[in-house]
């Protein structure tokens, strides 16, 4: 099994979701199934069908999270010593050379990505273009919307 890079915060978020699913969601759906069963005929019982479908989703998500956590390589960006090189977990201040606008991104795992929060997936075109670059370098990003160039202004390990 290959390892999946994830930040410390990302691992904590997955553990919190797993805990919630196991302690709140799973028992609630078991109760919903029991209540629906008590209504009698299961062949045309929409509440039962919905609860069983929800149970399948919850169990599938639990297995998915457990699998991800088992394969996770937790990386604490604050503990990185990459000598100014852009690596997974780094926070990067960039200047969009087309618009002149500054932008800041942190490179995170696929499950953690949230563009509105400035967190980009390690597998995104921009992250792939940035990995290995240093402050002052220019990265050319080839994306579906066309090519964009970014100058690396600062690399931080927060």
UniProtKB/Swiss-Prot annotation:
Q: For this UniProt record, give its keywords in alphabetical order, as a comma-separated list.
A: DNA-binding, Transcription, Transcription regulation
InterPro entries attached to this UniProt entry: GreA/GreB_C_sf (IPR036953), TF_GreA/GreB_CS (IPR018151), Tscrpt_elong_fac_GreA (IPR006359), Tscrpt_elong_fac_GreA/B (IPR028624), Tscrpt_elong_fac_GreA/B_C (IPR001437), Tscrpt_elong_fac_GreA/B_fam (IPR023459), Tscrpt_elong_fac_GreA/B_N (IPR022691), Tscrpt_elong_fac_GreA/B_N_sf (IPR036805)
Provide one Gene Ontology biological process annotation.
DNA-templated transcription elongation
Molecular function via GO: DNA binding; RNA polymerase binding
Q: Does the keyword Transcription apply?
A: yes
Q: Which HAMAP family match?
A: GreA_GreB (MF_00105)
Membership in a protein family: Belongs to the GreA/GreB family.
Q: What functional role does this protein have?
A: Necessary for efficient RNA polymerase transcription elongation past template-encoded arresting sites. The arresting sites in DNA have the property of trapping a certain fraction of elongating RNA polymerases that pass through, resulting in locked ternary complexes. Cleavage of the nascent transcript by cleavage factors such as GreA or GreB allows the resumption of elongation from the new 3'terminus. GreA releases sequences of 2 to 3 nucleotides.
Report the protein name in the record. Answer: Transcription elongation factor GreA
Q: Which organism is it from?
A: Ralstonia nicotianae (strain ATCC BAA-1114 / GMI1000) (Ralstonia solanacearum)
**Gene name, Swiss-Prot/TrEMBL:** greA
